[in-house]
UniProtKB/Swiss-Prot annotation:
GO aspect biological process, one term: hydrogen peroxide catabolic process
Annotated source species: Cebus capucinus
Name recorded for this polypeptide: Hemoglobin subunit alpha
Residues that bind heme b: H87
Residues modified as N6-succinyllysine: K7, K11, K16, K40
Assembly notes: Heterotetramer of two alpha chains and two beta chains.
Modification sites for N6-acetyllysine: K16
Job description of the protein: Involved in oxygen transport from the lung to the various peripheral tissues.
Family: Belongs to the globin family.
Length: 141
């Protein structure tokens, strides 16, 4: 459960992402594909090369979903319900992949905002991304 301090940290950190959200989403996806090559199997139709328009497009979708989760941090199950259905029933993404992408998102945010990535912010973002992952995998059961 996110504390009030966690929610503040997440909103502040994500606010600094701003217009870079799509780029950071794509960066995190590229990191995931390079670090965890098995994740590429979910994107057989994508050009996975650096800077690919498809990776950038999906990175924007990831970032938009996270922006939605931040905006509805107190009601993520409803805010992410359609996305949870999509990943569970149509795409059938292995739930472990959400943890892998979450890790890569943390690395991306730390790389782009090192001065702001304090231990407290890191912990809050980690808890937030774990909550998002839990919501996205809730329809698997």
């Amino acid at each position: 459960v996110l504390s009030p301090a966690d929610k503040t940290n997440v909103k502040t950190a994500w606010g600094k992402v701003g217009a870079h959200a799509g780029d950071y989403g794509a960066d995190a996806l590229e990191r995931m594909f390079l670090s965890f090559p098995t994740t590429k199997t979910y994107f057989p139709h994508f050009d996975l090369s650096h800077g690919s328009a498809q990776v950038k497009g999906h990175g924007k979708k990831v970032a938009d979903a996270l922006s939605n989760a931040v905006a509805h941090v107190d009601d993520m199950p409803n805010a992410l319900s359609a996305l949870s259905d999509l990943h569970a029933h149509k795409l059938r993404v292995d739930p472990v992949n959400f943890k892998l992408l979450s890790h890569c998102l943390l690395v991306t945010l730390a790389a782009h905002h090192p001065a702001d990535f304090t231990p407290a912010v890191h912990a809050s973002l980690d808890k937030f991304l774990a909550s998002v992952s839990t919501v996205l995998t809730s329809k698997y059961r």
